[in-house]
């Protein structure tokens, strides 16, 4: 088998779909046991966060059109997978992620904000909002053909759901099952996949801007290999 054929995207990557189903199972199970059995959030939060963490692998693959050779399928699945992440549409995430690849460790890299460690990683959502809206203004695409940018509309709609939740008395469930897990999950993902691989964020060469993790997570020991395998699905 040639290298091109070996790594060519198949008609459909079923393993990625299985991971998507697994991630959604965690996330939806947390919603079910919370709403039906009133299980305390101390138990549902970890379940929701595990779901969000698991879903990141297929979300990442969708941004690179790696789930299917059909781009429409990638986009459709991406729009479904992004739902638990609350703060962003799939198109917004794709733009930010591809900007990271285009400008890794440079000033224009949206993930460079994570360089201060866990504290900055937990604030990544605010930074991403600033980065994305600033890019819309600079590209003069906030309004297109007389209509508000669809990604802005998506974000407004999500926050409108929060307002509706407040009015009908389910705001606590929305926060516990959707917003807080998304906030924590994104912070955790940022730390593991933004800060750790690129920490010190000084190298911009494509062969040196990513580094391995020393210590418990080092790839040179059996424990590290097992942990990395779990973290990266």
Segments (PLM) and residue ranges:
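Non-catalytic, topology-defining segments of multipass membrane proteins
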Residues: 1-54, 83-180
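Active-site recognition of the HExxH zinc-binding catalytic motif
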Residues: 57-64, 68, 100-101
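Juxtamembrane/interfacial segments around transmembrane helices
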Residues: 71-80, 98-103, 126-136, 201-212
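Cytosolic-facing loops and C-terminal tails of multi-pass membrane proteins
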Residues: 166-171, 179-180, 210-230
């Amino acid at each position: 088998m040639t290298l091109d054929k070996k790594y060519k995207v198949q008609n459909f990557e079923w393993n990625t779909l299985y991971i998507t189903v697994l991630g959604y199972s965690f996330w939806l199970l947390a919603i079910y046991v919370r709403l039906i059995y009133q299980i305390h959030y101390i138990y549902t939060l970890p379940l929701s966060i595990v779901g969000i963490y698991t879903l990141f692998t297929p979300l990442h693959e969708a941004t690179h059109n790696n789930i299917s050779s059909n781009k429409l399928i990638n986009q459709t699945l991406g729009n479904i997978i992004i739902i638990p992440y609350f703060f962003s549409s799939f198109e917004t995430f794709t733009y930010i992620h591809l900007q990271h690849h285009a400008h890794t460790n440079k000033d224009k890299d949206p993930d460079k904000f994570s360089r201060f460690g866990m504290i900055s990683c937990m604030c990544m959502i605010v930074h991403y909002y600033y980065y994305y809206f600033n890019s819309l203004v600079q590209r003069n695409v906030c309004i297109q053909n007389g209509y508000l940018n669809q990604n802005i509309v998506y974000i407004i709609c999500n926050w409108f759901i929060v307002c509706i939740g407040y009015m009908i008395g389910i705001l606590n469930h929305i926060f516990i099952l959707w917003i807080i897990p998304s906030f924590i999950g994104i912070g955790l993902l940022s730390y593991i996949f933004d800060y750790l691989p690129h920490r010190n964020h000084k190298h911009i060469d494509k062969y040196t801007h990513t580094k391995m993790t020393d210590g418990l997570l080092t790839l040179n020991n059996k424990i590290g290999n097992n942990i990395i395998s779990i973290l990266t699905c």
